[in-house]
Amino acid sequence: MANSPFPLRSQVVTQGVQRSPNRAMLRAVGFRDEDFGKPIVGIANAHSTLTPCNMGIQTLAERAEAALRTAGCMPQVFGTITISDGISMGTEGMKYSLVSREVIADSIETVVNGQSMDGLLAIGGCDKNMPGAMIAMARLNVPSIFVYGGTIKPGHYNGRDLTIVSAFEAVGEFSAGRISEEELLAVERHACPGAGSCGGMYTANTMSSAFEAMGMSLPYSSTMAAEDEEKAESAAQSAKVLAEAIKANIRPRDIITRKSIENAISVIMAVGGSTNAVLHFLAIAHAAEVPLTLDDFETIRARVPVLCDLKPSGRFVATDLHRAGGIPQVMKMLLNHGLLHGDCLTISGQTIVEVLRDVPDEPSPDQEVIRPWHSPLYPQGHLAILKGNLAPEGAVAKITGVKNPQITGPARVFDSEESCLQAILSGQIRAGDVVVIRYEGPKGGPGMREMLSPTSAIIGAGLGDSVGLITDGRFSGGTYGMVVGHVAPEAYVGGTIALVEEGDLITIDAPARQLHLHVSEEELARRRARWSPPEPRYKRGTLAKYAKLVSSSSLGAVTDLNLWD
């Protein structure tokens, strides 16, 4: 590939007499005379031993590196960070999770631009790796491909499949006296059997599936198990495809368009994906300069059915979906019914129609993961945008898989996740209550923690169908039940959620997509006059910088919005 038909960015480093010192440094890392005309490709390697999500990524990076060399490129491997949501969940450390999305994006952008690289292959596993990498790709706009680290296989105990969410729910079950300490320990020991990202259609698998649908990852790659050989082969194949994309000068913004983002959102709805996808795709669209709002998610939700019976509210995990035909099977069904844009370009240079040409029109009848079109799990999508006087800018809810999609009840108000969790575990929350967790938003937390511990405790206590929960924080992809997150404006900036008092009646009406506080405008005005913002929880360091810069969740919680206005 030494004779690329397009000018290489790396020539500012590799060509000319003045760059002799630059070349001297490159020779030290393995460049030879004949290598200075080859494309330099960065491999953003999120390998880490702190989480099973990322502990198998080094093998994928090595396979991709070798394949890039064979394809005539010069790979340069660099590290980027990860936070384990599952390990930090319920702790102060979870405040860094969403922050890490920005750190990942900024770090990849910094290295690729700082070293004048010609292409990027990013490999990630845990939740924020995916959007962080894609935000960077959209900003950089050099030929890029994303390689997912792969999903974990399910654990097994007492005749049932387990995921990490099983362990969170077991805590609630134990606290409610529904299981013994021995059973709790058994679930803990069996929930995570090896490498790979959390196994249901939680955030990591949702985002990887969406990237495949968008055309930035290879077909079938998003549902492969991390420990299977086909995942390593997929990393090598991704490298080969990227080398060809560099030749053809196919760039992320050729792929990340309004149409392809609509395709991704349609697939997210069809597979029953995570609420976090809303936040992340708002941020990805912002990075790619593609107009996208919360209302667009609601428009797509209304026309796309849920086709896949996947955890957290369903029965199966991502490896089951892979055996049933994977994301291409879901996409083919959507395409056949006019719910995908088939003319979108993918990183391989093919269109969506071309990629899906040989995929069957309907799923195999000998599986139950993907429902036939005439018999969907739900006739409309599950991620609803709720609005009302409690969320004028909007809020995000999962509205399928709940027995009671409407609830009106007294507010139980908590100004932190920890105080709420303690109340649940000590039996203070009753059927019919509407739990409010506030000051957990992007600025207020800061960091918009995921409320998996409280929601799992509610489920474990047997209250999942009778208790509502709203928050200006987020939810894990493993959350289900009558839960509403991303309430905006958040409490810290004076949103209505800051004015809720203990015992106020709140209505969550999922079918009507309403979130209403039953307090008069006059009383709210009196409360607002008395309200003042709390002192920032952090005044120095990463969280302080984040809180100062971050936007509303309704805009994706981005940190580079209107910086110079």
From Swiss-Prot:
Phylogenetic lineage: Bacteria, Bacillati, Cyanobacteriota, Cyanophyceae, Synechococcales
Keyword terms of this UniProt record: 2Fe-2S, Amino-acid biosynthesis, Branched-chain amino acid biosynthesis, Iron, Iron-sulfur, Lyase, Magnesium, Metal-binding
Gene source species: Synechococcus sp. (strain JA-2-3B'a(2-13))
Gene Ontology biological-process annotations: isoleucine biosynthetic process; L-valine biosynthetic process
Alphabetical list of SUPFAM superfamilies matching this protein: IlvD/EDD N-terminal domain-like (SSF143975), LeuD/IlvD-like (SSF52016)
Cofactor note: Binds 1 [2Fe-2S] cluster per subunit. This cluster acts as a Lewis acid cofactor.
The family this protein is said to belong to: Belongs to the IlvD/Edd family.
UniProt enzyme class: lyase
Binding site for Mg(2+): D85, D127, K128, E450
Subunit note: Homodimer.
Active site as annotated: S476 (proton acceptor)
Binding annotation for [2Fe-2S] cluster: C53, C126, C198
Stored PROSITE patterns: ILVD_EDD_1, ILVD_EDD_2
Pathway: Amino-acid biosynthesis; L-isoleucine biosynthesis; L-isoleucine from 2-oxobutanoate: step 3/4; Amino-acid biosynthesis; L-valine biosynthesis; L-valine from pyruvate: step 3/4
Designated name of the protein: Dihydroxy-acid dehydratase
Function per UniProt: Functions in the biosynthesis of branched-chain amino acids. Catalyzes the dehydration of (2R,3R)-2,3-dihydroxy-3-methylpentanoate (2,3-dihydroxy-3-methylvalerate) into 2-oxo-3-methylpentanoate (2-oxo-3-methylvalerate) and of (2R)-2,3-dihydroxy-3-methylbutanoate (2,3-dihydroxyisovalerate) into 2-oxo-3-methylbutanoate (2-oxoisovalerate), the penultimate precursor to L-isoleucine and L-valine, respectively.
GN (gene name): ilvD
Catalytic activity entry: (2R)-2,3-dihydroxy-3-methylbutanoate = 3-methyl-2-oxobutanoate + H2O; (2R,3R)-2,3-dihydroxy-3-methylpentanoate = (S)-3-methyl-2-oxopentanoate + H2O
EC number(s) stated in the UniProt entry for this protein: 4.2.1.9
Taxonomic superkingdom: Bacteria
GO MF assignments: 2 iron, 2 sulfur cluster binding; dihydroxy-acid dehydratase activity; magnesium ion binding
Chain positions with N6-carboxylysine modification: K128
Cofactor: [2Fe-2S] cluster; Mg(2+)
